[in-house]
Amino acid sequence: MIDLKEVKERMGKVSKAFQNELINIRAGRANPNILNKIQVEYYGAPTPLNQLASVQIPEARVLLITPYDKTSLKAIEQAIFASDLGLTPQNDGSAIRLIIPQLTEDSRKELVKQVKAEAEKAKVAARNTRHDFMSDLKKDNDLSEDSRHRTEDDIQKATDLEIKDIDRIADIKEKELMEI
């Protein structure tokens, strides 16, 4: 027997993962979440940046990274250089400033393409989840034909809702990116 609660829960995880991916797409404004994936080599172990420093937003397009331990400043700077952020850290000896450049029209369009690609991946993940549940349903011989069709309809409705949610989230991000 398929639990619809589990279907909705797994579908919800798809849009949550999609939202987390979109956080990493910068929109010309300072957002500390763009630093979430940065690992700093600290005493020989890769350590998340947010465990080594506080990140503040003093201005709309500036991130200020203040390490808890000043000796980690150079390692943090190197990790930012090595990342795929495309930002140049400015080290003033006690903190690092990251200036987020204004997006050009071309870079905005490129980021919108990236959002659409991520949205498509999320939709595929939702459809794969639907496929998994439909396969499980076909294997369940204890269900009557009516129950099976009703459950298939419910799974399809959950998938359709998830895809609508993904489209809504993508539209919001696209508008944010195209905003000047």
Curated annotation (Swiss-Prot):
Signal peptide limits: none
Record bears the keyword Coiled coil: no
UniProt entry keywords in alphabetical sequence: Cytoplasm, Protein biosynthesis
Classification via InterPro entries: Ribosome_recyc_fac (IPR002661), Ribosome_recyc_fac_dom (IPR023584), RRF_sf (IPR036191)
Cellular component, GO annotation: cytoplasm
Annotated region described as Disordered, given as residue ranges: 135-156
Main location per the UniProt record: cytoplasm
GO biological process annotation, one example: translational termination
CDD domains: RRF
Location(s), subcellular: Cytoplasm
Molecular function terms, GO-annotated: ribosomal large subunit binding
Keyword Protein biosynthesis applies: yes
Family membership noted in the UniProt record: Belongs to the RRF family.
Described purpose of this protein according to its UniProt entry: Responsible for the release of ribosomes from messenger RNA at the termination of protein biosynthesis. May increase the efficiency of translation by recycling ribosomes from one round of translation to another.
Cross-referenced NCBIfam families: frr (TIGR00496)
The name this protein goes by in its record: Ribosome-recycling factor
Organism: Oenococcus oeni (strain ATCC BAA-331 / PSU-1)
Organism ancestry: Bacteria, Bacillati, Bacillota, Bacilli, Lactobacillales
